[in-house]
Amino acid sequence: LPLILLSLLNSTAALAESLYQVEVIVFRQAATPISAGQLPPDNWAQNALPVDGSNSRTPALNAEAGKLNPSNGYEVLLHKAWAQSLGESISRAAISAGDEQFGHFPIEGTIGLKGGRVIELESDIWVNQIDTSGTIADSERIKQSSRLTSGELTFVDNGSLGMLIRVSPL
């Protein structure tokens, strides 16, 4: 009996953590930029796993990103896809776009996800205006918590910025 219970616990733990494809599009809406009133911290990545060659995936939302063009009043700032394990505790991925200067990127932030019946999202994305000396002059921010349904495209609105996110099982 103890062996059966142990094997059930191990299989439950294995099921509790599953691999997902996460795809994010961060874009600017036609509105005037709204300052966050603060600059991103130097530790903006907060020990999150970076999205790099080891976990990046081919984006699938290219048609949706294509509709977010200047003639429609939008500008895509970041479009990335990656593989991420989701379980009972939140796991964070660090995303960025543009050239790094003094530890910061023009677009940088974290996407935190927690699995379960619904997927819990904690987004903290900074869109930085970097001056000619390489320092951040001002920033916009998307900091929101949401609940996502697996496989569904979700829109996160934040005034002058928006984000589309889809989390699908692999």
Locate each region found by the language model.
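Extended, low-hydrophobicity segments enriched in charged/polar residues
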Residues: A16-R147, T154
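Soluble periplasmic/extracytoplasmic beta-strand elements of cell-envelope proteins
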Residues: E23-I25, L164-S168
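Short, exposed beta-strand-loop hairpins at the edges of beta-sheets
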Residues: E152-N158, L164-R166
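N-terminal signal peptide c-region/cleavage motif recognized by signal peptidases
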Residues: L9-A13
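Pocket-edge structural micro-motifs
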Residues: Q144, D157, P169
